[in-house]
Amino acid sequence: MCPMRPRRFYFVLLTVYLAACSPSTAERPWADQIAFDRAEKDRSFRERPESPLPPDRKGTFTSLSYFAIDESYRVPASLVVAPEDARAIVKMPTSTGQMRDMVRVGRLAFTLKGQALQLSAFVEAGESRVDRLFVPFSDLTTGRESYAGGRYLDLTRSPSGVYDLDFNRAYHPYCFYNATYDCPYPPPENRLPVAVRAGERLPD
């Protein structure tokens, strides 16, 4: 689960509406599923009470802005897991000036656009279960074509250690839409030296 919080520190579940409303991904081709999930997220932002949009923006909201769906930004990644007794605590600054303690579970190794790259995967300190991994990142679009505070990926823990790293599912944290949310910024180790033109982007 991505660790975005309202300032009153309740947890936010970003993807619950997709799990509840979406049929199995096996029922649709990959690109169609991405398009469907984007439409569902747009609808959630417009209609659901847990939408991060302030009330004065809901009435004019139509859809989020996305890069075109591009399968070249969907790559396999291998997670090199750190031993439990050697997992580092990384202090991440947040959008409200706080510090968040995150545990580095391991590093995802993958190749994107011909470059061998790595991203660290985290869980929030104190989490008793490690069934979802939080992967915040920045890249060469950050602050230009995408939010200056970076973007996030959420991964369901894979027993095999191999992950479907799909940057078409990269999303902006809630603090991009509403300053009352407290969102961690990606650490320096997760700055990618490539432009990831996939997933959510800034409006034109």
Question: Predicted regions span which residues?
Answer:
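Bacterial N-terminal signal peptides that target proteins for export
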Residues: C2-F11
